[in-house]
Every structure is written in structure tokens, then in C-alpha cells.
Amino acid sequence: MSITNELLGDKFKHPVAAYSVAAASSNASVSVTQTDFSICAKGADIRYNLGAAATASTFYIPKDETYFIRVPVATTVQALRDASTDGTLLITGFDPDR
């Protein structure tokens, strides 16, 4: 990633959509139509994946953390709880052109 005279968060200024995925004992997903989005784990540590099922060995986001993600095309976000506590993966889509 390169940063040129801009703040890292400059491209994530204008939220345009909100999604959520229940992260429980089985994989759940939501289609995200934006290519710039954030994910936030609420209530539990969560395993997530983009475009394929979340498993015990896919990407990890700790409880109450927020990650900003940019992908080349719209995708599905898949979620699964990391341990025995259910949680929710909150997703905010951003307009990349504003």
C-alpha cells in the first residue's frame, strides 16, 4: 500500500450501505456491492473470508476491532464465530469516488 499526500482513511469517508452477518457456529454470508468497506466484530472474536466460506483457519478479527478493506470487485463476506460465543460482523460500504 502506498500513501501519497493523503490520510490513509481518505477513501473511506462516505458511507453508503450497512450490512451485518450473524457469526455463529455455522458459516453465514452477505453480498457486499461496494469495493471499499469496513468490518467490525461485535460481541465475539470472528473468523471471516471474502468470496468463500469462513472456517477455523481463515482470516481473524478480534472482538471490537475494525478493519478497512478494499477489493477489486464486489464480493461476499462470510463469517463464523472463532470460539463458543456468537457475535455479529458489522459491515459499512463506502463510495470509493467521494
Label every model-predicted segment.
Residues 35-37, 71-86:
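Noncatalytic modules at the cell exterior or secretory-pathway interfaces
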Residues 41, 50, 81, 91-93:
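Residue-level recognition of conserved beta-strand positions in structured domain cores
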Residues 40-57:
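Short, surface-exposed beta-strand/strand-loop-strand elements in extracellular ectodomains
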Residues 1-18, 93-98:
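Short, intrinsically disordered N-terminal pre-domain segments
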Residues 15-34, 56:
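Surface-exposed ligand/attachment interfaces on beta-rich extracellular proteins
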Residues 62-74:
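Beta-sandwich interaction modules
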Residues 46, 85-95:
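Edge beta-strands of jelly-roll/beta-sandwich modules across compartments, strongly enriched
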